[in-house]
Amino acid sequence: MITKLFTKIIGSRNDRTVKALKKIVKQINELEPQFASLADVDLQAKTVEFRQRLEKGEELDSLLPEAFATVREASKRVFAMRHFDVQMMGGIVLNNNQIAEMKTGEGKTLTATLPAYLNALTGQGVHIVTVNDYLARRDAEWSRPLFAFLGMTVGCNLSGMSHEEKQAAYACDITYGTNNEFGFDYLRDNMAFAAEQRVQRPLYYALVDEVDSVLIDEARTPLIISGAAEDSSELYIKINTLVPLLQKQDKEDSEEYQGNGHYTVDEKARQAYLTENGQIFVEGWLKQQGLMGEDDSLFSVANITLLHHVNAALRANTLFERDVDYIVKDDEVIIVDEHTGRTMAGRRWSEGLHQAIEAKEGAKIRNENQTLASITFQNYFRLYEKLAGMTGTADTEAYEFQQIYGLETVVLPTNRPMIRDDMGDLVYLTEQEKYDAIIEDIKIRVAEQRPVLVGTISIENSELLSNILTKEGIEHKVLNAKFHAQEAQIVAQAGRPSAVTIATNMAGRGTDIVLGGSWQAEIDALENPTAEQIATIKSEWQVRHDAVITSGGLHIIGTERHESRRIDNQLRGRSGRQGDPGSSRFYLSMEDSLMRIFASDRVSGMMKKLGMEHGEAIEHPWVSKAIENAQRKVEGRNFDIRKNLLEFDDVANDQRKVVYEQRNELLESADISETIKLIRTDVLDRVIDQYIAPHSLDESWDIAGLELRLRTDFAIDLPIAQWIKEDDKLYEEKIRERIISEIEASYAHKEELAGHDVLRQFEKSVMLQTLDNLWKEHLAAMDHLRQGIHLRGYAQKNPKQEYKREAFELFTQMLEALKQQVVSVLCRIQVQEPDVDAIEEQRRQSDSAQVRTYSHEEINALAEDEAESVDGQAVEPFVRDGAKIGRNDPCPCGSGKKYKHCHGKLD
């Protein structure tokens, strides 16, 4: 109460921020007459002027008023569109590394041009991030004329582009693209084998559209580049036949309750668990099928894989529904985004879940994958020097933006007052009663000539509602993942009088629903439209537009509350854009997912006290409050999950940064021979220490073991025992120096044979391949560690601290293995001696004075195989083409001279 009163007197933090923004906008507005008087050439010259001022040391932010005034004036001339003051405020917020909450229809696409232009002046590149390829392409094409007028280039980064197209897109001043594509390009760049293969420049400024969708909804989903692992499709099919034999046990309030079921389902945590009875039953079944030994336990280390398959099959059959969580198309299981209702082609669930669902649906089972590289959106976007975002609904997640990304949220006022009527929720006892009420509401709105947008939370629900409307004879359009291709066309005409559109969640987000329909879409559908046709279309649209405005605007119907209040607000936000009239209402039932899982007891109690009858709805602030509290609980739980994910991923992220930084240095270095020499000395020191301990008596030395190790790991046969026998004063340090000296000499000889440049390139190639192989294995080890780390809590240990400690140990081991394997491969390479016949042939064909043969492909193969070799095992050397010729042997040409005095001179 006191806080509210205090805020009312001095204003909230947001109010004070908006007040400060208005002062800067005033400065920009004062420049408008001056910039309006400039000729096109003079206005365009401003870009060059700004860049010169930056080069002379002027701060970027000091250019803001003039740069924004330039963009506003250019927009007036190119698009005949003038940035509103609230859009100017939005641009300032975005330049200040903050999140701008701008309501639907306030012109976020035009707003983005302001900070994009200003930050592109630095020449470091601006990335404008959208949620799908359609929006990226649309926004890039729309903004290109404006930026071209100002002398800037615009690129578009889409999936499926060639390497050259991507390089060209990233080389532009401003690049539009999707969050997925930017993230995957980053990972691919860090798997490149040459600096010129990379496409991205250093990450400077990212402006994220629909920032809540990208940084919050998708934060739990890591981007993963993977390769195929072992095939276990038959096992998935077999285990899937087990699940129908299992009986579900209903959870009871009493912890002592012991049911007879085989498994329980926790819908909140999206997990299924075997009961004690279930474990006994599953063990017996697996033994019957010959998948487990008679004396084996399901929980023994040897059977962890089987348990993993059983858990995946159980979750697939009890928690994941077709046309809700995924669709099956062309014998492929495609995930449906729970937040947008869009399909996510190419994405797969991990931990065998996707394969279990494929087995359940009888679809082709793809191999499990091994992670080659991964990163979460949380960590990818934190790599940018500057990060900002915009959305219509950020305030409910302001705390998370601040905590995770360090981004403040600024809620901007609308250009015109909001007049949408958000009516209270209506709650029914059953789903059938709810749908009956929705149909009646739709009939009323259609009769009033009002367009209706019905939001559902799944494809299944959208098709159920569509079937009911079809039976009732109500014409409508369905917009869900199955009709993704028609998305833009359906949304464009969703504002026509009496139009009824059913959409899953926020499908169609990013495209405004214009009251009366989109006249632009009608014109675009015509080939070479005449001026008369355009005038007719606009005239007819105006009549429809006025009719819809008069009847009350777009009516929004929510068929269920989403887990997040923000998603509900996004649905409501489709109506009432730019001061248009509109209304919204949510219809709920006690059988809805959210109500059943989180709010059922409290609301059910209220409804029973009120004596609800069939078909009767309850509309009361208490009910709305209870539902909102349920949503807050879910939001809090999801925030904890995301925060927990980040805390664990931060450990891997620190390691990722080190590896990628070292990898990039490798790519950009022409010569790493000094690094290799240091590594070689370090590795040899460690190896020698294992057999000749520092400051130890010679009786404890294992000379035979050292000779064997040097032979197998470094391909050098050194008679160390003979050295000691010949010189009894040869102490430890001298032995060490002599071993290293011999190996260095051997390596120098290889360099003579192979050539300096070739060996330098090969060293780099071996280092990169070995690093990539070990990093891949390290990621698998980290994933394995992560999956079981929570069990440390039972031993009264902090799982996060244990994870950090063990992850560091794994990382240290990986770095040591890297040194060991690189040195071993480089020491074991065999360079082919010259083939005399080939030399003679070459000499006859040309005047070339020198020929060397070097099998690069064979050496590459050795580098790849090294990761699989086991310590102590000898590796076959390269096979030489032809017999080796000693320098004192007779020359094969038949001259009778020694080889070294004849064709051997060519060496």
Curated annotation (Swiss-Prot):
Domain of life of the organism encoding this protein: Bacteria
Main enzyme class: translocase
Needed co-factor(s): Zn(2+)
The enzyme's E.C. designation: 7.4.2.8
Binding residues for ATP: Q87, G105, E106, G107, K108, T109, D512
List of residues binding Zn(2+): C891, C893, C902, H903
UniProt KW Ligase keyword: no
Keyword vocabulary terms for this entry: ATP-binding, Cell inner membrane, Cell membrane, Cytoplasm, Membrane, Metal-binding, Nucleotide-binding, Protein transport, Translocase, Translocation, Transport, Zinc
CDD domains, per database record: DEXDc_SecA, SF2_C_secA
Cofactor comment: May bind 1 zinc ion per subunit.
Main location: membrane
Subcellular location: Cell inner membrane; Cytoplasm
Keyword Cell inner membrane applies: yes
Pfam families: P-loop_SecA (PF21090), SEC-C (PF02810), SecA_DEAD (PF07517), SecA_PP_bind (PF01043), SecA_SW (PF07516)
Catalytic activity: ATP + H2O + cellular proteinSide 1 = ADP + phosphate + cellular proteinSide 2
Family listed: Belongs to the SecA family.
Oligomeric and partner information: Monomer and homodimer. Part of the essential Sec protein translocation apparatus which comprises SecA, SecYEG and auxiliary proteins SecDF-YajC and YidC.
Protein name, per record: Protein translocase subunit SecA
Species of provenance: Tolumonas auensis (strain DSM 9187 / NBRC 110442 / TA 4)
UniProt lineage: Bacteria, Pseudomonadati, Pseudomonadota, Gammaproteobacteria, Aeromonadales
Gene from which this protein is expressed: secA
